[in-house]
Swiss-Prot record:
Gene responsible for this protein: prvA
Stated family: Belongs to the peptidase S17 family.
Leader sequence residues: 1-20
UniProt keyword list: Hydrolase, Protease, Serine protease, Signal
GO MF term set: serine-type peptidase activity
Phylogenetic classification of the source organism: Bacteria, Pseudomonadati, Pseudomonadota, Gammaproteobacteria, Cardiobacteriales
Enzyme class: hydrolase
Cofactor: a divalent metal cation
Segments for region (Disordered): 87-109
Protein name: Extracellular serine protease
Gene Ontology process terms (BP): proteolysis
Entry's EC annotation: 3.4.21.-
Top-level division of the source organism's lineage: Bacteria
Role according to the record: This enzyme is a chymotrypsin-like serine protease. Degrades a variety of substrates present in the skin and hoof of the sheep, including elastin, keratin, fibrinogen and collagen. It seems to play an important role in the pathogenesis of sheep footrot.
């Protein structure tokens, strides 16, 4: 008996199904004939992938391409974990020094394919060593801002200097990096290096006490005092009030607006400068910490930094001895100790502290980023990471001189205290602890 065309088609379909079907790449189906073998193979692949994930010595074998394809079908989560570790190990081998996070990507840049910074055009002087190592023959070229190959970059900040500045009088100062914890700073043997100076200027965050929020009750008490003073002036008949009294009233109205604008949480997490003692305010508003000094209070020592003509001849860095909050001249520190080197004109008003870019010389860049909330033409704020001008202590900075005012107070007594009826502002900075830094050498003007 001959088979009909329909019978042949049915037999062909059954045969294909039993073989797993044409070009299908999925794992073999578990039919009664091969199901046990497929299950054993799948378990073996998962066991091999798990061993690869748990391996700490790098000795476990990787999956083959076919095994990876099978794993992606039978256990998607395990496959994703396997591929993640595989990429981490590849990055660790190729970019171990500059990528401590082992992601291979920084700011959406693949470090293996793209530059982590743009380029800058330069003309190198005949005596300058700028970029000479990487481009010995090119005196005019475009070079990466980093200026060094990836393998020579350092994720732990030990070779980073933010800026080196030669002032008009010829003295040299450097701006230090924001420090890591002093306990895990490297042990440097070359005491003449700028790296040794950076290590010397590390901030110990465990000792640093940042400001707490303002006392809300005391702030409200100051507001009530100002309200009482305004009411005393407003009681004066409009035909009798003098020009001086009108001006005084305007000052207290402005002071009220300032007090109302203060956010009690604004100083939280900041450290601020006591311009009289050249120390930091503690979290209670008292002056006392020598962990960080703002400004060029420690003389920059040319024997540490070297000059345009000679190299460094430094002895090991010497920490300063403080007298009444001011460091002595015996230290070999470079500029300011610790957090950020700052140079500014101190004062009790926002304008005096902030100044302008020219007056305050606040041109320091923190890791290449200049901190400003306004355009270059309009800005007045200092160019430091999270810099602010704040009232820090609970009541001393908040128009404390006008305490004790009552409805019966004499305007003459209030007028006598006018000059002290103000908010005292302080330059403050929010400390930053940098656990990982992806780029090695972020510099300012390092060459003569």
């Amino acid at each position: 008996m001959k088979l009909s065309h329909l019978s042949l088609a049915i037999i062909s379909a059954i045969t294909l199904a039993a073989c797993g079907g044409g070009n299908d790449d999925k794992p073999m189906p578990q039919d009664p004939d091969n199901g046990a073998l497929v299950e054993q193979r799948n378990e073996a692949i998962k066991k091999k992938a798990t061993a690869y994930l748990e391996d700490k010595d790098g000795k476990a074998p990787a999956l083959t391409k076919d095994e990876e394809a099978t794993l992606s079908q039978i256990d998607e989560n395990l496959f994703n974990e396997y591929k993640k570790k595989q990429k981490e190990l590849e990055n660790q081998a190729s970019d171990d020094e500059v990528d401590p996070t082992k992601t291979g990507v920084v700011g959406n840049l693949d470090l293996g394919k793209q530059a982590s910074q743009g380029t800058t055009q330069y003309v190198r002087g005949t005596k300058s060593s700028f970029d000479a190592e990487n481009n010995p023959k090119e005196v005019s070229s475009a070079t990466a801002i980093l200026g060094v190959e990836a393998k020579t970059q350092n994720p732990w900040l030990t070779n980073i200097v933010l800026a080196r500045k030669v002032r008009a009088d010829g003295t040299v100062s450097i701006m230090q990096y924001l420090g890591n914890d002093g306990s895990d700073a490297a042990d440097f043997t070359n005491v003449k290096s700028l790296q040794a100076q950076n290590d010397h200027n590390v901030v110990k965050f465990s000792d640093l006490k940042t400001n707490k929020p303002l006392d809300e009750a005391k702030l409200e008490a100051q507001k009530k005092q100002v309200d009482l003073i305004i009411k005393l002036y407003e009681k004066i008949d409009s035909s009798e009030i003098t020009t001086e009294e009108k001006e005084e009233l305007e000052k207290f109205v402005a002071l009220k607006e300032e007090l109302n604008a203060i956010d009690i949480k604004s100083p939280e997490g900041y450290v601020g400068l006591d311009e009289k003692a050249h120390k930091l305010f503690s979290e209670t508003g008292a002056s006392g910490s020598d962990d960080i000094i703002f400004g060029d209070d420690v003389p920059t020592n040319n024997s540490v930094l070297g000059t345009a003509d000679t190299g460094s001849g430094a002895i090991p860095p010497v920490k300063p001895i403080y007298t009444s909050g001011k460091p002595g001249a015996d230290a070999t520190g470079a500029g300011a100790l610790g957090l950020v080197g700052m140079n500014f004109k101190v004062g009790g008003t926002q304008e005096a502290i902030q100044g302008t870019e020219e007056k305050s010389q606040s041109s320091t860049r923190v890791f290449g980023r200049q901190y400003n909330t306004q355009s270059r033409a309009e800005r007045k704020f200092n160019s430091y990471a999270d810099a602010a001008v704040l009232a820090l202590s609970s009541e001393k900075d908040l128009a404390n001189a006008i305490a004790g005012i009552t409805d019966q107070s004499e305007l003459a007594n209030i007028t006598a205290d006018m000059k002290n009826a103000k908010i005292n502002y302080h330059l403050a900075v929010k400390p930053q602890k940098l656990d990982y830094v992806q780029y090695g050498r972020v510099t300012g003007n390092l060459d003569p």
